[in-house]
Amino acid sequence: MSKTMIEKVDEVLETEVCAADQKMINLFGRLNNRKHELMREKKAKQEDLEKATDSQDDLFIADDDSKFKYSMGEAFLEVNKEDAESLIEKYINKLEEDIKKIDSDINDINEKHKELKVILYAKFKNSINLEE
């Protein structure tokens, strides 16, 4: 073994992992999983928002006396143009609120990640990898 490799092994062996350290490492992992889950959820909601916006545009150019099928759960309701516009507007607003909430949650996780990285890298230096 080279001298630098031996030094690295010695450094790893010298740093003991206590229960509090392990809890922080586990928390980092759980937060990382949650962040990826939120990112997938955000992507799905953004796709739904795009579809809803397209539907809203289609309604705009439709005849006023037309009837539209609106999906509610597993059922379809036949509604007039005004009701359809109102329902889609409410749905779009809900999606936008959900996306803002997800963004806020992701930012909170990023802040906690930064805090944990500072603490854990200070103790374990290069013997721990907290990158995604």
Curated annotation (Swiss-Prot):
Record has Chaperone as a keyword: yes
Record has Endoplasmic reticulum as a keyword: no
Entry GO terms, CC: cytoplasm; prefoldin complex
Keywords noted in UniProt: Chaperone
GO molecular function: unfolded protein binding
One Gene Ontology term from the biological process aspect of the record: protein folding
Pfam families per record: Prefoldin_2 (PF01920)
Record-linked InterPro entries: PFD_beta-like, PFDN4, Prefoldin
Function of the protein: Binds specifically to cytosolic chaperonin (c-CPN) and transfers target proteins to it. Binds to nascent polypeptide chain and promotes folding in an environment in which there are many competing pathways for nonnative proteins.
Recorded family membership: Belongs to the prefoldin subunit beta family.
Subunit structure: Heterohexamer of two PFD-alpha type and four PFD-beta type subunits.
Protein name as annotated: Probable prefoldin subunit 4
Source species: Dictyostelium discoideum
Gene: pfdn4
